[in-house]
Structure formats: structure tokens, C-alpha cells
């Protein structure tokens, strides 16, 4: 009979694990900038084009860029020093984001799309690597706490970053939000550089060629096909992106720019919509984990409950009779989605061997971004091609 693993507290983890603390601080700063950027580019696209399809296209590009790059990111994370990959990803994104300052009118929307593809393509390498390095900088009894804190931080920065990003863009314009996003990457790289990290990935005598990278990237799919229990866990996020989140990306921009217009071009309103989702996603992993602990059975039951809570949120949003009701629906939608997202990741972290961790997380990320692209693309297309109401988009 194996002894039950003790879960450390959040305070113990942050104060006692310097490496995790630096990784976490880098995450806080870069995520804050990311949400500034998303608000800025979404509102800029809506204002320049006035098209739901164009807005949907932005989110399709954001998703597809990560879909293409994330399997290769997983290969790199299993082959090279994960810390260096994270640092260089941040530095490259700093220079790319500054390019958004050049977009001034609708004729340059191609440039906005191109820069978005480059930025999110590198993010598709960064995020699987960040997931893969987490068990390298925490002990086994810290994994559940670290993953919950990481997810809560994402949610908190969604709430705070989206709110502040909306306020900044709505009050002072798009450019300050872009500058803040760019410099957030440099600060993130600084904190990651402070991590004391010894490479745990397996070195190979075979040189890494383009063909071998392509071949290795598909090993994540192969592993999932041979391990059905892992496959179910790894497709939870993709299911959410296809059925819920992809459509809602377009829906929120449409609501803020055409229905509840607050701030310049609806920037402030969009920030509020993202922020309330962030509040829901922030509190739910902590509350749910307080009930379930890190026990596998409890985590699985919570994932099931998360789908029901998500449905409640969508039902509250459906009438679109008031901003308050839409915000309440967004809170519950975020609450349910976060339970599914965080607990499926916790189970994967506990079950995946180190040698395939990067490729499996890369594959998972590819699937969820592809699903998000399909959801966003269909949402924008339905709005423009069929003149679909926002209520019917929620029903879908």
C-alpha cells in the first residue's frame, strides 16, 4: 500500500521553492502583457474592419499559429534545454509585438495578422515547454499545488490584465497597451533566467533535422493513441475550445463593440467581459481543490461537474438583456471551464513520463488550438454569412 502524497500549501511552495517562484513571477508579468495585447488587437481589428468575420479571422490565426508550432515546441522541449527555450521565446516576442505599432488603417490588416501569427507561433513553443519544465522545478508533492497556482495566476492575470488593458486602451489608445505587452516579455525572460535548472531531457546522438522534427512531433499523437486514458484527459481542453471558448472569443468582441459599448471602440467593455471570466477561472480551482484535494477520483468527478457549471453560465448569458446578466454568465462559464482545464492538466502531470512529456503537451496544445480556430472561424462566419443573432451563436 503506497503512502498518500502530502500536498504543500501555496505559501510553502512560493517561499520555499526559489525556482518555481521565478517561473511564477515571469508568468505573472508576461500574462499581464498578453491580455493587454489581446484586447488591443481585437478592438483594433473590429474598429478597422467592422467585420465579425475579420474578428473571427484574428482568433483563427491566433489558434492556428499555435496549432502548427506547438507539436514542434514539444519536440524541442524534450530535446533541448527548456529554460533556454523559454528565454529566447520571450526575447523574440518582444521584437515581434513592437511591430503592431505600425498598423494604422484597414489596408494593413494583413500586417496585424502576420505579426499575430509570428507572436502566437512562438507562444506555441513557449507554453508546452513551460508545462514540461514544471515537474523539473517542483517535487512530486508540490505538483498539484504548483499547477493549481499556475492556473489561478493565469486566471487572475486574465481578470486584472483584461480589465487594465481595457482601461488603458479605452482611455489612452492602443499603443500604450502594445508597449506594455512588449516589455512584459523582457521582464519574464529576466525572471526565468534566474532559475537554477539542470537539463533533464534525454540527449540524442542523432542530429536534429527538419524531417526528424516532423517525425518526432507526431510521436505525441502516437503515444495518445496507445494510451486511451491519457487521450481522454488530453482532449478535454480541445472539447472546451470547440464547443464553448472559440465561439465566445468572437461573441465577446461583438458584444463589446456593438451592444455594450464602453470606452474607445468598446475596449473597456471587452476588458470587463474578459475580466469576469478571469475571476471565475481564478477562484474555481482553489475552491474545487479544497474539496477534492489531489485525489484522482475527486479530480475526475470535479471535471464532470465542471461541464454542468459551464452550461449554467451559457444559459445565463443567452438572453443578452443586460450587461450584468452577461457578466454573471461569464463568471460561471469561467468557473466551470477552469475546473476542467486545471484538473485535467494535474492528472496529466502526474501520469506522464518525463521523456514524452513535452511532446504530449505539445500535441494537447495543438489539438486545443485547432479546436479554438474552428470554433472562432465558424462563429465569425455564422455572424456574417447568415446574419446570425448573438443569442443563436450562444446556443451553438
For the regions a protein language model found, what residue spans apply to each?
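Pair of pore-lining "gating" transmembrane helices in MFS-fold secondary transporters
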Residues: 11-43, 117, 226-245, 331
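Hydrophobic core of transmembrane alpha-helices in multi-pass small-molecule transporters
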Residues: 28, 96, 109-125, 325-339
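Short amphipathic helix-loop junctions that connect adjacent transmembrane helices
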Residues: 39-52, 250-267
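Loop-to-transmembrane helix entry/capping segments in MFS-fold secondary transporters
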Residues: 52-53, 140-150, 267, 354-363
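Conserved MFS/SLC helix-loop-helix module at the cytosolic interface between two early adjacent transmembrane helices
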Residues: 66-103
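C-terminal transmembrane bundle of multi-pass solute transporters/carriers
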Residues: 68, 72, 85, 99, ...
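Hydrophobic alpha-helical transmembrane segments
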Residues: 109-120, 145-203, 268-271, 275-283, ...
Amino acid at each position: 500500500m503506497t503512502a498518500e502524497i502530502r500536498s504543500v500549501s501555496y505559501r510553502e511552495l512560493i517561499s520555499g521553492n526559489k525556482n518555481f517562484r521565478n517561473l511564477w513571477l515571469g508568468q505573472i508579468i508576461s500574462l499581464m502583457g498578453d491580455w493587454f495585447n489581446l484586447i488591443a488587437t481585437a478592438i483594433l481589428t473590429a474598429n478597422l474592419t467592422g467585420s465579425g468575420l475579420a474578428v473571427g479571422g484574428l482568433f483563427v490565426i491566433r489558434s492556428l499559429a499555435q496549432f502548427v508550432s506547438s507539436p514542434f515546441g514539444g519536440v524541442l522541449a524534450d530535446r533541448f534545454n527548456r529554460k533556454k527555450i523559454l528565454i529566447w521565446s520571450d526575447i523574440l516576442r518582444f521584437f515581434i509585438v513592437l511591430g503592431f505599432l505600425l498598423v494604422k488603417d484597414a489596408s494593413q490588416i494583413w500586417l496585424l495578422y502576420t505579426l499575430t501569427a509570428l507572436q502566437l507561433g512562438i507562444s506555441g513553443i513557449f507554453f508546452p515547454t513551460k508545462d514540461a519544465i514544471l515537474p523539473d522545478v517542483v517535487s512530486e508533492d508540490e505538483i498539484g499545488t504548483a499547477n493549481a497556482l499556475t492556473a489561478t495566476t493565469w486566471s487572475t492575470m486574465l481578470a486584472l490584465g483584461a480589465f487594465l488593458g481595457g482601461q488603458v486602451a479605452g482611455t489612452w489608445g492602443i499603443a500604450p497597451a502594445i508597449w506594455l505587452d512588449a516589455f512584459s516579455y523582457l521582464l519574464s525572460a529576466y525572471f526565468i533566467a534566474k532559475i537554477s535548472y539542470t537539463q533533464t531531457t534525454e540527449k540524442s546522438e542523432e542530429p536534429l533535422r527538419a524531417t526528424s522534427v516532423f517525425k518526432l512531433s507526431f510521436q505525441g499523437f502516437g503515444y495518445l493513441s496507445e494510451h486511451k486514458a491519457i487521450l481522454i484527459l488530453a482532449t478535454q481542453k480541445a472539447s472546451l475550445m470547440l464547443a464553448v471558448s472559440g465561439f465566445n472569443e468572437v461573441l465577446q468582441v461583438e458584444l463589446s463593440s456593438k451592444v455594450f459599448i464602453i470606452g474607445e471602440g468598446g475596449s473597456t467593455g471587452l476588458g470587463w467581459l474578459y475580466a469576469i471570466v478571469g475571476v471565475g477561472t481564478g477562484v474555481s480551482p482553489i475552491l474545487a481543490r479544497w474539496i477534492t484535494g489531489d485525489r484522482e477520483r475527486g479530480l475526475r468527478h470535479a471535471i464532470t461537474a465542471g461541464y454542468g457549471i459551464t452550461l449554467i453560465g451559457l444559459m445565463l448569458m443567452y438572453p443578452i438583456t443586460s450587461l450584468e446578466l452577461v457578466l454573471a454568465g461569464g463568471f460561471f462559464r469561467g468557473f466551470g471551464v477552469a475546473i476542467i482545464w486545471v484538473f485535467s492538466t494535474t492528472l496529466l502531470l502526474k501520469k506522464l513520463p518525463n521523456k514524452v512529456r513535452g511532446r504530449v503537451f505539445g500535441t494537447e496544445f495543438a489539438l486545443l488550438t485547432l479546436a479554438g480556430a474552428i470554433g472562432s472561424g465558424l462563429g465569425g462566419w455564422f455572424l456574417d454569412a447568415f446574419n446570425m443573432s448573438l443569442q443563436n451563436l450562444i446556443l451553438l
